[in-house]
Amino acid sequence: MTPFMTEDFLLDTEFARRLYHDYAKDQPIFDYHCHLPPQQIAEDYRFKNLYDIWLKGDHYKWRAMRTNGVAERLCTGDASDREKFDAWAATVPHTIGNPLYHWTHLELRRPFGITGKLLSPSTADEIWNECNELLAQDNFSARGIMQQMNVKMVGTTDDPIDSLEHHAEIAKDGSFTIKVLPSWRPDKAFNIEQATFNDYMAKLGEVSDTDIRRFADLQTALTKRLDHFAAHGCKVSDHALDVVMFAEANEAELDSILARRLAGEPLSEHEVAQFKTAVLVFLGAEYARRGWVQQYHIGALRNNNLRQFKLLGPDVGFDSINDRPMAEELSKLLSKQNEENLLPKTILYCLNPRDNEVLGTMIGNFQGEGMPGKMQFGSGWWFNDQKDGMERQMTQLAQLGLLSRFVGMLTDSRSFLSYTRHEYFRRILCQMIGRWVEAGEAPADINLLGEMVKNICFNNARDYFAIELN
């Protein structure tokens, strides 16, 4: 019987253990996509307690707690921090088989150093007190934890109208060497069908000093904000493409669509597709000219529980996997961006694992001469961000493309404790390659495979995003 979560956790061959301990474990972290609040990094925020750093805002945990019958007041409601933590501690023993069980105990191990102890109601007091004592120390501040975890770069997720003042403040502080850069997330300028679109256009027009009436005005406003982001070191964009659409339109049609929407008129699905296509093609060309990377997160079905959406708002754990077809529209969109050789470096993520092979083959259609891995099939995302999801994604990438050119893991998280997801990924990667070696499917060449592992863990992302590190 193998003990739970030793230093050789998941490393079930000698070759995997060598790969992880000698090549993967000590690689720095390049976390190119996350949802950390830049204000907390700028202020070097001190966490009040374990709830504040661990459960607050974590919709993964809330979903598990709800499934365990926990009342909403103990998830997102007005219960005390300790009551919410106790509700989570009572849920954890029921999460065996869910990645939350592994994540929870990895996060207690690093950075808190808690090993040999499982979170449950009987250990809740001890773990709460021990972690809170550590959180009072300087090296457990927001920046302190990032430094402990050997982070070199994080890419936050930011709206085009954001001032980026916190990024500027961080950049000016020469004592803090981790790069904290904005990522451009223009969903609100793109989702013309949303009720909030007109209000957002007014805000975008104000910050860009542009009167947005025609499509060219929107392009001008977005270009000004792209320049603003570039001035703050941005090299990455991110788009939530819940449904991939494609329909072409001329400028007069786009002007009419935008004008009618700004006048409060409803649009047809075809008109929505025309507008979204034009925005994505325009932005893709801008990214290509600037050397940016674009990310497409495809296939979420959001806000399914309308009653809870009205009570609690979005992003609180009521989203799931969509099953809309996407291959044909995605192909047309990428091909259109590529017509003038203005398809930027692109990472494609799918939420439905059914679509893994769709993306794994799609990226091969648009690779770039002289640019290894220009088109990437992104790491297992959201509901696929677990052991078999990551194994599936990497196995299919290896079979359909080049795993050796993969840019690797990202946290996609709102928590400063989620850096252990990189450790989890690295262990799974080494386990997978070790099994290939054990089965005679890959050579037992530790230098060849060790270098490949180092590249996937850090070097490929550093080179791909072309961000100068301190």
Curated annotation (Swiss-Prot):
InterPro entries on file: Metal_Hydrolase, Uronate_isomerase
Protein name from the UniProt record: Uronate isomerase
Lineage: Bacteria, Pseudomonadati, Pseudomonadota, Gammaproteobacteria, Enterobacterales
Source species of the chain: Escherichia coli (strain 55989 / EAEC)
EC number(s) given by UniProt: 5.3.1.12
GO MF terms, alphabetically ordered: glucuronate isomerase activity
Enzyme type, top EC level: isomerase
Keyword annotations from UniProtKB, A to Z: Isomerase
Pathway(s) this gene product operates in, as recorded in its UniProt entry: Carbohydrate metabolism; pentose and glucuronate interconversion
Similarity field: Belongs to the metallo-dependent hydrolases superfamily. Uronate isomerase family.
Matches recorded under PANTHER family: URONATE ISOMERASE
Catalytic activity: D-glucuronate = D-fructuronate; aldehydo-D-galacturonate = keto-D-tagaturonate
Entry annotated with the keyword rRNA processing: no
A single BP term in Gene Ontology: D-galacturonate catabolic process
Disulfide bond entries: none
